[in-house]
Amino acid sequence: MFEHVTVLKNESVIGLNIKPDGIYVDCTLGGAGHSQEIVKQLTGGGHLYAFDQDQYALSHAKETLSPYRGSFTLIESNFRYMREKLEELGVHHVDGVLFDLGVSSPQLDEDERGFSYHRDAPLDMRMNRSQSLSAYEVVNQWDFIELMKIISRYGEERFAKQIARKIEQSREKKPIRTTGELVDIIKEAIPAPARRTGGHPAKRTFQAIRIAVNDELGAFEEALEAAIDLTAPKGRICVITFHSLEDRICKEMFREASKGPDVPPGLPVIPEEYKATLKLITKKPIVPTAEEIELNNRARSAKLRIAEKQ
């Protein structure tokens, strides 16, 4: 069973300011929690396009959304190809786009996916199981410098150098095949006092490898740029992030688009090309309530930012 608790569901769907006849995009279908809330508000010409590259998520969503057949289209693709995929379907403008950038709970919980540092499983971490690059290749084939860079940048891990060195030493003896083996190596690399504070010692390194395997930050930047272009005036873009790297990208791109270019002094009327592209709806991100965090601890780090196309 595909069980997934949707984070900030009401806040994000309300944030989209849905029109019943509008065209909406859920870039991260997952357990279809957001998609279901969106599609149930659509009537007549309203339509939802939902992206996921996980076949299991798509087949589950097809069943979940079956009462709304005709009002939604499921697209098996990375959301970085949103513009091309929508254009193939004749869609050139939309009224709202939603991103929920958390890894869905079933992906974390399925042992064979290799996302979790709590369970021993093959090193995989691919969102799209048909792609060739997996965590096994990153851990066993990328050189020391590349490993150190991704663990430092994507994991914001202060012991990146020590961890990369320990991985390099370990794989010289034999390939690192499982998440359990990798966790033990990371624990060995981190000084004992640091292991006792700040959560699980492997958390940051696992995040870094997952981001590298799936090019998550590159995909998000491309997709958010496309979303800003495709959204029609008064349409909304809602982004739920779960770590500072993604939140920083969203914050910066929203801020840049809400400023517009510098206007030459002395103009009586501001030309269209100097007007801001977006208006920020949330000056500060919306975060989950204490009640939501109590019900779903994975919501703890979630942040929702909303912008409206001008």
From Swiss-Prot:
Molecular-function GO terms, alphabetical: rRNA (cytosine-N4-)-methyltransferase activity
Reaction catalysed by this enzyme: cytidine(1402) in 16S rRNA + S-adenosyl-L-methionine = N(4)-methylcytidine(1402) in 16S rRNA + S-adenosyl-L-homocysteine + H(+)
Keywords: Cytoplasm, Methyltransferase, rRNA processing, S-adenosyl-L-methionine, Transferase
Functional note: Specifically methylates the N4 position of cytidine in position 1402 (C1402) of 16S rRNA.
Subcellular location: Cytoplasm
GO BP term, example: rRNA base methylation
Pfam families named in the record: Methyltransf_5
Domain of life (superkingdom): Bacteria
Enzyme Commission code: 2.1.1.199
A single cellular component GO annotation: cytoplasm
Name of this protein: Ribosomal RNA small subunit methyltransferase H
Main localization (coarse): cytoplasm
Residues holding S-adenosyl-L-methionine: A32, G33, H34, D52, F79, D100, Q107
EC class name: transferase
Organism, as annotated: Halalkalibacterium halodurans (strain ATCC BAA-125 / DSM 18197 / FERM 7344 / JCM 9153 / C-125)
Family: Belongs to the methyltransferase superfamily. RsmH family.
